[in-house]
Each structure stands twice: as structure tokens, then as C-alpha cells.
């Protein structure tokens, strides 16, 4: 097993291509590069470094969209009509998880893999995995993500799951409290 360094943007992209929890980076890259698992990989020898050509800024180019501000996005969610219309805590819980995933899928994925109970798995890439960890878990798909989550836990447990993910995503404590307080 070799280690390579990649930039954060590429890491987030690779992590966003995860199809199931536990899928290795090698598996994801093989799938993205359309390599067969048994296909030998030709060694690459780098003999010289090549500098990228300088590109002149053209007036017709559209500006790149600014990076999302996670705190602002969460505040907008809490103030949105779609969120306010949700009467069930489980629906608000799912919408929060969906938004968190859209903000930083790589960190969400890492965090979801580590958040679990003493005997229960809370997040999985498929419904069957959650059903196997308990018959009464009531798994639900998190919209816009490859994840499923248990939903028959009490509200405090749901808050703890969201809190753990938001902490891993480095949200400020006061923002975490605001979001968790709305579940």
C-alpha cells in the first residue's frame, strides 16, 4: 500500500464518489478510472516537471461561484419556509443531514462512519445494513446523499448525531446548539 498526497478539493471529490461506507480510496479510484480490480497498473515514471501554461484572464469569462459559507447555509436552512413547514422532528433531522452533506460530503462521510452507538450502527450506505443492526431501526434515506440513517431513536439521540457531525465539520458551538435545538 502506497501513500500519496492530494489537495483538499480532489480529496473531497473522491470522497463524494463513495458508494458505500467502507469503500476504500483505491476502490473508488479504480471505479472512476474504469480499471478492473485484476488489471495490472503500469508504473508511471516522472522524469521532469512540467509547468502549466499561464492563462490570461479574459473579460468574457464568468466568475467562479464563491465557496459556500457553512454557517450561513445552515442559518438559511433554519429560516427557510421548507424547513419551517416540517412538523415532524424526523423530517427536520433528515433535512439537516442532507444540508450538512451538501456542504462538505467528505467530512460528513468520515464522520458518519464513526458515529454509532454501543450496539447500533446509525449511518450506512444501504437500508439492509441498518436493518441487520436492529429490526426496529426504521431506516430512511437521507435525500441527496448515498446514506441511510436510523430514525426510530429519540430526539436527543438525533441531536447527538447531528452535533457529532457538525463538530467534525468544525461548526461553532453556538451554531451547533441552534441547529440541534430545532430538531
UniProtKB/Swiss-Prot annotation:
Translocase in keyword set: no
Q: Where in the cell is it found?
A: Cytoplasm
Chain residue ranges for the region called Interaction with DNA: 118-122
Highest taxon of source = Bacteria
Q: Which GO terms describe its biological process?
A: negative regulation of DNA-templated DNA replication initiation; regulation of DNA-templated transcription
Could you tell me which cysteines form disulfide bridges? none
The cross-references to Gene3D superfamilies, in alphabetical order and at most eight, read: Met repressor-like, Replication modulator SeqA, C-terminal DNA-binding domain
Q: Which is a Gene Ontology cellular component entry for this protein?
A: cytoplasm
Record-linked InterPro entries: Arc_rbn_hlx_hlx, Ribbon_hlx_hlx, SeqA, SeqA_DNA-bd_C, SeqA_DNA-bd_C_sf, SeqA_N
One Pfam family linked to the record? SeqA
Q: Does the keyword Chaperone apply?
A: no
Q: What does this protein do?
A: Negative regulator of replication initiation, which contributes to regulation of DNA replication and ensures that replication initiation occurs exactly once per chromosome per cell cycle. Binds to pairs of hemimethylated GATC sequences in the oriC region, thus preventing assembly of replication proteins and re-initiation at newly replicated origins. Repression is relieved when the region becomes fully methylated.
Its recorded name reads Negative modulator of initiation of replication
Q: Which organism is it from?
A: Proteus mirabilis (strain HI4320)
Q: What are the top taxonomic ranks of the organism? A: Bacteria, Pseudomonadati, Pseudomonadota, Gammaproteobacteria, Enterobacterales
Identify the gene encoding this protein: seqA
Amino acid at each position: 500500500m502506497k501513500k500519496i498526497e492530494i489537495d483538499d478539493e480532489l480529496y473531497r471529490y473522491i470522497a463524494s464518489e463513495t458508494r458505500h461506507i467502507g469503500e476504500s480510496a483505491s476502490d473508488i479510484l479504480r471505479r472512476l478510472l474504469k480499471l478492473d480490480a485484476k488489471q495490472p497498473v503500469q508504473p508511471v515514471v516522472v522524469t521532469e516537471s512540467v509547468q502549466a501554461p499561464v492563462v490570461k484572464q479574459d473579460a468574457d469569462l464568468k466568475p467562479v461561484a464563491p465557496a459556500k459559507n457553512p454557517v450561513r447555509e445552515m442559518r438559511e436552512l433554519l429560516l427557510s419556509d421548507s424547513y419551517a413547514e416540517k412538523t415532524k422532528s424526523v423530517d427536520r433531522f433528515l433535512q439537516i443531514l442532507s444540508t450538512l452533506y451538501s456542504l462538505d460530503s467528505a467530512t460528513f462521510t468520515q464522520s458518519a462512519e464513526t458515529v454509532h452507538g454501543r450496539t447500533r450502527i446509525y449511518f450506512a450506505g444501504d437500508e439492509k445494513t441498518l436493518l441487520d443492526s436492529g429490526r426496529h431501526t426504521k431506516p430512511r434515506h437521507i435525500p441527496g446523499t448515498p446514506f441511510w440513517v436510523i430514525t426510530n431513536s429519540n430526539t436527543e439521540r438525533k441531536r447527538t448525531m447531528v452535533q457529532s457531525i457538525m463538530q467534525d465539520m468544525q461548526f461553532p458551538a453556538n451554531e451547533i446548539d441552534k441547529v440541534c435545538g430545532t430538531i
